[in-house]
Regions:
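Secretory/organelle targeting and membrane-embedding segments
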Residues: 1-28, 32-290
């Protein structure tokens, strides 16, 4: 992989080698810089060589089968669209948990990036955009992009006090994962022993628009966690708890889970009567959709 700081020079070398012809296409992926200013600078350097219609800024998470299925789930099935709003959804969780630490010398890159830059500002915000966007006018890349941008622009901003209330950053410590002893983040190869870079980040976001006003979106990502999974879960609000309020299990709510990896699929958690001759308690069951 080429560091994004070299994108501009690489583009000039391509041009000087005579390889930039009208049918040429440039494919780039994150990280594009380390902040807004460096991202603008890199994009400007690329634009000196390539036209916008030659440039493809990609996110490989969007190539995952279940991620591609989100728009179909939402907009091709009338059972979901009426419920897909703050009136019925209590909160949304987007989780990416990884077993891996800094294997393969990845510490040199990761210690300069961290969990937020490495995963949240690209992969997880892409998933959030697919969950929260309005229906595009068509399935063209520009139309889908425009609706995603609307979502990102309506994410509520945070000042220092809001960050303290809504964001957590952490590092993993020495411990065991399965039967293997693993070092702390600061003891990993090619990581600064005094590093303040986060290997775990969690945040609560709000989208200030008509559909999602008041519904929190919880995003979390971490390394060296006991479970390896990337998934989205939409927790629906519970119905008025009148009929079954005295029964065990009645406080559970319906949850739609979209599993991105490793086991792709979708399921709905639903309540039902526990088998038996009397109505003693309720139990949760998973209805697989995909």
């Amino acid at each position: 992989a080429i560091a994004s700081s070299l994108f501009g020079d690489s583009c000039r070398f391509i041009r000087d080698s005579g390889l930039n012809v009208p049918q040429s296409r440039l494919v780039i992926e994150k990280p594009i810089g380390k902040d807004k200013l460096t991202a603008i600078e890199i994009n400007n350097k690329i634009a000196e060589v390539f036209k916008e219609n030659q440039i493809y800024r990609i996110d490989h998470y969007l190539g995952k089968e279940t991620a591609q299925n989100i728009m179909v789930l939402r907009f091709a099935n009338s059972i979901f669209e009426p419920l897909w709003r703050s009136r019925f959804i209590d909160h949304v969780q987007i989780t990416c948990a990884e077993h891996l630490g800094m294997e393969g010398g990845r510490g040199a890159y990761y210690d300069k990036a961290g969990a937020a830059r490495d995963m949240v500002q690209n992969h997880l915000l892409q998933l959030l955009s697919l969950i929260a966007m309005e229906p595009p006018t068509d399935l063209s890349a520009n139309s889908v992009r425009d609706e995603k941008v609307k979502v990102l622009r309506t994410i509520r901003g945070m000042g220092p006090e809001e960050v303290r209330k809504n964001v957590i950053r952490a590092q993993y410590t020495e411990g065991t994962l399965g039967s293997k002893t693993v070092p702390s983040y600061r003891d990993e190869d090619r990581v600064d022993p005094k590093s303040m870079t986060e290997s775990y980040v969690a945040m609560r976001l709000f989208i200030d628009n008509w559909r999602w006003e008041g519904t929190p979106f919880y995003i979390r990502m971490g390394k060296r966690l006991p479970t390896k999974a990337t998934e989205i879960s939409l927790h629906l609000k519970s119905p008025p708890n009148v009929l079954f309020q005295k029964l065990p299990g009645s406080t559970e709510s319906n949850v739609l889970t979209i599993r991105i990896q490793p086991d792709e699929g979708m399921s709905v958690r639903m309540l039902s009567k526990k088998p038996g001759t009397t109505l003693q308690n309720l139990c949760c069951g998973e209805l697989s959709l995909l």
